[in-house]
Amino acid sequence: MSENERLRADAGLPRAGSADRPVVEVAVGVLIRPDGDFLLTSRPEGKVYAGYWEFPGGKLEPGESVEQALYRELVEELGIQVVQTVRWKEQLVDYPHALVRLNFCKVFDWHGDLQMREGQSFAWQRLPVLVSPVLPGTV
């Protein structure tokens, strides 16, 4: 099985048994600089899909809103304090390991310098992105 087949991520063509899996809610931060570039980070070693590029963020904890989870995750992962988020879109993605709802939020304003607290790399990008591989569902 090729890497692309393994990482097929299309909720419109779900895998066998996908309907029985619970949906994992994930807050996703699309950090955008004034010049229009957006931030992608690489998944660190030890995590599923290590080395793949994605927007920063993470799973919602019980009782958290998308915004609360995003604020927490960006402190944990990047060491920044978000000033405000703007809910953007939702996307249901059928990964081999989980059925995931990505809750995208645009972030235009934050305090602090980026610190890669989980050993990940980062890159400011424009479309088409230059980093690879990119996790399906990201861009």
Can you describe what each PLM-predicted range is?
Residues L13-F38, K59:
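Conserved N-terminal beta-strand and adjoining loop/helix that marks the start
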Residues D20, K47, L60-S65, G119, ...:
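Residues at secondary-structure transition points
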Residues E3-R15, V86-W88:
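Short Pro/Gly-enriched beta-strand edge/turn motifs at strand-loop
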Residues V28, G51-E54, S121:
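Residue-level recognition of specific faces of alpha-helices
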Residues V24, R33, Q81, K89-L114, ...:
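Active-site-adjacent beta-strand/loop module that shapes the phosphate/pyrophosphate-binding cleft
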Residues L130-V131:
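A generic structural signal for short hydrophobic patches within well-formed alpha-helices
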Residues E77-Q84:
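Short secondary-structure junctions
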